Amino acid sequence: MALPGSLNRYLLLMAQEHLEFRLPEIKSLLSVIGGQFTNSQETYGKSPFWILNIPSEDIARNLMKRTVCAKSIFELWGHGKSPEELYTSLKSYPVEKMVPYLHSDSTYKIKIHTFNKTLTQEEKVKRIDALEFLPFQGKVNLKKPQHVFSILEDYGLDPNSIPKDPHNIYFGRWIADGQRELIESYSVKKRHFIGNTSMDAGLSFIMTNHAKVKENDLVFDPFVGTGGLLIASAHFGAYVCGTDIDYNTVHGLGKASRKNQKWRGPDENIRANLRQYGLEKFYLDVLVSDASKPSWRKGTYFDAIITDPPYGIRESTRRSGSQKDIPKGIEKCPESHVPVSLSYHLSDMFFDLLNFAAETLVLGGRLVYWLPVYTPEYTEEMVPWHPCLRLISNCEQKLSSHTARRLITMEKVKEFENRDKYSHLLSDHFLPYQGHNSFREKYFSGVTKRIAKEEKCSHE
């Protein structure tokens, strides 16, 4: 089948974790780097092998400079469901596209990658020898080759039922690897300043990619905590800032979250985290502030808002306020005063967040946030809605047998008007989502039932 325009076929080798997050990440990144998402497969599902149509090798390389969901990308020369189909496909690949990488002055090596099966060395050599019909003119160099070619075999997803023959076989020229090493180099275990709910490094980079963060963007986190999401954005050259209602967290005070450490040190703060990774120049500031009462002037400031609001499980949901009938006026409080706080219903928190994003994001800017859900009752109608924001993706991460959190990505498609502020009250999504006010109770009721069941089994 002829490809549209000047598109070339590439094979993506995907990582087998966070499966739902992979497609939105690739789509978002392609739109950032000037590509357009078109595919030659109807669905990707859980397979680690994706075939993409991409305009140029430069775009393929730029994609791999950002993605943490993909391991490698290859220029696809041929594929089939059997060795014979693969060889037929390779023989039909234009020779003029092969020659630049196979001439006599070049060096190369051929690698074998199998998914869900291990081959013996003898089997690997047999597969490589079968490619002798390709016009390789260069010399083999296993240590520092100019060009690397790969045979990739897919034996399905079931480790308990591995077929004798692969479902699909691919052959291509290696182009580049993804950024999987960032997950280790930015690991929370190695981070100077952490909290109880510091975001996993891999998920932080996925959120940043879903938000289409790019160099010189302004990124904001209204529930900043220890700033893990800011670090991922700063890595890609964005300027970062945030707010949090917790004075101790913002200033790096109070009890430490690390084992065998009682109190936080004098230099444990968000700025020190960015300094640790050489990213301090991208740090603007972090403020003690209440997300339910934004203190920003009217206007569109942010290219992206990326956040992980508290769910009331490991961190409390709070807003400033008082139970008294006549709370003390803020104008009477000294500058150093930290207001008392009230509980902050989850539904109110998320609708406040959407309103804030609609008011302060630039047109085309993205809001990326986590939404906790009680799985037995979840429906798509529960995802908060706003007339200025369009839902881009909704990806699930399971937390337990009965709870999950969903990574919601929204894009601003319309300028904010005052009448939009309370439009959610008229939405069909409002009443279903109010049930999330009891997410904490449902979470702990599930935990209690599980513990009781385990205790009952242990006594039988």
Curated annotation (Swiss-Prot):
It is an enzyme of class 2 (transferase). Keywords: Acetylation, Cytoplasm, Methyltransferase, RNA-binding, S-adenosyl-L-methionine, Transferase, tRNA processing, tRNA-binding. Its main location: cytoplasm. Pfam families: UPF0020. It comes from the Eukaryota. GO terms for cellular component: cytoplasm; tRNA (m2G10) methyltransferase complex. It is found in: Cytoplasm. One of its GO terms (molecular function) is tRNA (guanine(10)-N2)-methyltransferase activity. Gene3D superfamilies: Vaccinia Virus protein VP39 (3.40.50.150). Its EC number is 2.1.1.214. The modification N-acetylalanine is found at A2. It catalyses: guanosine(10) in tRNA + S-adenosyl-L-methionine = N(2)-methylguanosine(10) in tRNA + S-adenosyl-L-homocysteine + H(+). One of its GO terms (biological process) is tRNA processing. Signal peptide: none annotated. Catalytic subunit of the TRMT11-TRM112 methyltransferase complex, that specifically mediates the S-adenosyl-L-methionine-dependent N(2)-methylation of guanosine nucleotide at position 10 (m2G10) in tRNAs. This is one of the major tRNA (guanine-N(2))-methyltransferases. Belongs to the class I-like SAM-binding methyltransferase superfamily. TRM11 methyltransferase family. Part of the heterodimeric TRMT11-TRM112 methyltransferase complex; this complex forms an active tRNA methyltransferase, where TRMT112 acts as an activator of the catalytic subunit TRMT11. This is tRNA (guanine(10)-N(2))-methyltransferase TRMT11.
